[in-house]
């Protein structure tokens, strides 16, 4: 599929006008397309070790998107026709608190009964990356598949004309390329991270296993209860990312356009050791105990198993992702990775690729890049640190059908109300705006930590008996409107008002969460939550209209 590497002595046509991307997966190819879109005269080279076309279905995980990543693919990169024609529209997140249960209709279901306004997608990574590779070649990007990077010699950051030198091998021939900018998009191999000693652990200790089945897994077929089946319109629960939950874990079911289904277990490393599930047979034994309905569905499809893999201790940070004077960057999993829950991987690709594109723009314009690199890196790490408390020490809550739906509501409101607003309204790359918002964003980050701590304490205080019920996110008018409003185009005053309103809503939601928990466990300490409100006086005001979900049949 690729172009053909010329003779081994080749240098780039114009190294000073070249960006070289190591890694031609989702992060690398989307960055290449974004650079080509922004700078038609820029030479963009992508080196990918895998041969194209890559296999459908059993290629890579990271198959579900949420709103930032979905917007990046569909609108920023213009991939909406491909998403509509060749991928699946996602029916939101859906949760069943069914550990050990034989019938889904007997437990709490959390999800939307109908599609919300702002779309997201389920991605067959093989289909998508083949299309990205095709588009790269069509648009004049030099995409070299089957190409192994052998050595990297970084440019001298003190010499503005110094270039990076990358030796790579394809079909037995070695070539040395030069580039002004070098980006590592090569995933967990972390070539630059290892070379520069940038690896950084975090406190989130979790593992994951996954596999693909060459068949559709439709949870609606697991029940004959007419009322339960009628809850959703359209009746297509299979298009959701379905989460089957229990203490310390969640199992994903993600449909793929190729006709396969992706299945995974993500779990706290202590509660569910990886050694109990790191082969397909062990995973099946684990399902037999924790998810008997899923076990029965998989047991009859053993002959349709397409692959199996696992990651131990999958979450990590990074000491540095952008270097302005050095003109290098990390994107995707070559930098940081949080957790598969809430599918933040594509979001962070969208954000880092956009920052990298802006850094290249500043450099091409002859402006000093160091300041922008430092600011963008600070923002990027702040977003990572903002989301990390959503996961760290929170996996026990997956087994709590009372607290977890409240946590999901909070997490979404925080994501849509703050993080998405910054991305959709192009504020993340506006250094002036981000400077003015620094204190506000730090304060709401502190509130998020306080709420996460409170939710964990609520879960530890006790468990109520689960009952059959539907918690319908689409029934919350304010929640559906928050989702719809993501695509509004706002001028500066309207954005400021939007953010102020959303912070007030987060304050109110935090206080209502405290009130609901105190109705059961009045001894819970909520002082940290109250002290972190954007408006401390709000705790003395009436709580207003109920923002929390109420069960339906």
What are these regions (language model features)?
Residues 36-61:
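Glycine-rich FAD pyrophosphate-binding loop
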Residues 11-27, 45:
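Beta1/beta-strand and adjacent pyrophosphate-binding region of the FAD-binding site
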Residues 54-102:
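N-terminal FAD cofactor-binding segment of flavoenzymes
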Residues 359-553:
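C-terminal helical "tail/cap" subdomain of flavin- and related membrane-associated enzymes
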Residues 135-293, 353:
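Predominantly flavin-linked oxidoreductase catalytic cores and closely associated redox partners
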Residues 27, 31, 52:
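Conserved Rossmann-like nucleotide-cofactor binding loop
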Residues 247-249, 255-257, 271-359, 363-395:
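FAD/FMN-dependent oxidoreductases across multiple families
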Residues 68, 113-134, 273-278:
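Short beta-strand to alpha-helix junction loop
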